[in-house]
Amino acid sequence: MRLFVGIFSAARPNPTITRRASSFTFLSHKVCLSTMTASPSPKPNGNGSKKEIKILMLHGFTQSGTLFRAKTRALEKTIVKLLNPISLLPVFLYATGPNRLSPEDIPGYQPPEEPQAEDYQPDTWAWFRKDEASGNYRLLEEGMATISQAIRDAEGIDAVCGFSQGGAMAALVAAALEPERSLPEGKEGDWARGLREANSGHSLNFAVMYSGFLATPDSLQFCFEPKIKTPSLHFLGSLDTVVDENRSRALTDRCQDPLVLVHPGGHHVPVSKQWAAPLAGFIKEHGQDKEPKAEL
């Protein structure tokens, strides 16, 4: 595992480091915003020799694709700018989880003093719901089906990036798309087979997790045994009180040669240029196909 703590120079998109033990509406600079209606993925237009890197963005618990994009907009712009000189064009695809949350599901929720409209529903969603009694993930199959549809709508993806619960999902997606990984028979492996079909049997170039954590249900351990081979970058917040550091490190321990960065913040995606730079360097390193991808 490669572990780095501190601040990277924004002037160095690919910093020198040392090693230690769903549907889309296309916006400016090829950024995609998820909606809940189907539309086809657009074709390249006027990008010249730029290589597109399609990155599926998975939001956290109580968020949506729209909200996640709003929170990472500055990060998008910086990444696009840093990669422009080397002719890489990141395409950010935002999907929204299918499981709607009520206000009472939101941690720390307090009823408003003034009554709200009876039909009021916040834009809060989840990829799955944890059953506290059994530890299993309810509605995970629905979450994965939404991701599979997003991949089909995009005509395949090259990478995945997730925050918090979305980070846990990103790890599962990356693992499931590794063609050499054995999948369980029957229902337990159907969601993974659906992902492979959606991405035409292609593995991912890389995966990025912000405040991600290990999915612990026994039925999902095939994703971590053997370790995830897909190149992975993990951002941990030194002041994160929502996802305990041990939970995040349990995930990094299940990844082969992970790159781990610790930022001096809490439970959020750091979007400043100094933290966008190492992400841009990681995309630069792994964005190009190094060998033909395996087919099913």
Where are the language model's segments positioned?
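Short beta-strand/loop motif that positions the catalytic acidic residue
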Residues: H234-L236
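Active-site nucleophile loop of the alpha/beta-hydrolase fold
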Residues: G97-P98, V208-A215, G265
